[in-house]
């Protein structure tokens, strides 16, 4: 029960950050013609490509895509607890994991607002971490469009049964 309350509290705090309105600019300036809104299919294509880039980076132990693809305030929830962006970036090159291949499937996109999206999918990995087979997992990542760039702000994985 405490875990559920903690998770709910974290998600509530996270939602307040994601949905916060930007402060008004002090001086009004003519704004360029706004870009047309992306379709849901375009957003899913963009975010699934971003997820694949991060999975490739994890496989190749390359922290650079995590530095550029995660928001500064990003965090993940894993069996180790809450991990901040800097924890993830530091862990990537030294993770005791060997991944031969992976497959991502069953993609679904839920728009939480015009600039916040939840992408869910299944991740199947042929590999090991600390000598144990990596389980197939259901993944969820929340992205926020900040300054025209989609950045991951939250990630979580749950092993399938």
Residue ranges with predicted function:
Residues 1-4, 21:
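Positively charged n-region of N-terminal signal peptides that target proteins for export
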Residues 3-6, 113:
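Long, low-complexity, proline- and polar/charged-enriched segments
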Residues 7-17:
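Bacterial N-terminal signal peptides
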Residues 21-68, 73-161:
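A beta-strand edge to alpha-helix "cap/lid" segment located at domain peripheries
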């Amino acid at each position: 029960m405490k875990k559920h309350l903690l998770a709910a509290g974290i998600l509530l705090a996270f939602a307040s950050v994601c949905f916060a309105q930007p402060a008004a600019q002090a001086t009004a300036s003519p704004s360029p013609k706004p870009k047309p809104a992306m379709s849901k299919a375009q957003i899913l294509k963009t975010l699934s490509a971003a997820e694949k880039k991060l999975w490739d980076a994890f496989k190749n132990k390359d922290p650079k895509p995590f530095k550029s693809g995660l928001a500064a305030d990003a965090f993940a929830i894993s069996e180790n607890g809450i991990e901040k962006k800097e924890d993830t970036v530091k862990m990537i090159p030294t993770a005791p994991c060997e991944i031969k291949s992976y497959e991502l499937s069953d993609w679904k996109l839920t728009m939480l607002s015009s600039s916040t999206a939840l992408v869910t999918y299944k991740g199947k990995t042929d590999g090991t971490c600390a000598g144990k087979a990596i389980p197939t997992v259901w993944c969820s990542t929340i992205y926020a469009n900040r300054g025209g760039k989609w950045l991951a702000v939250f990630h979580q994985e749950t092993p399938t049964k």
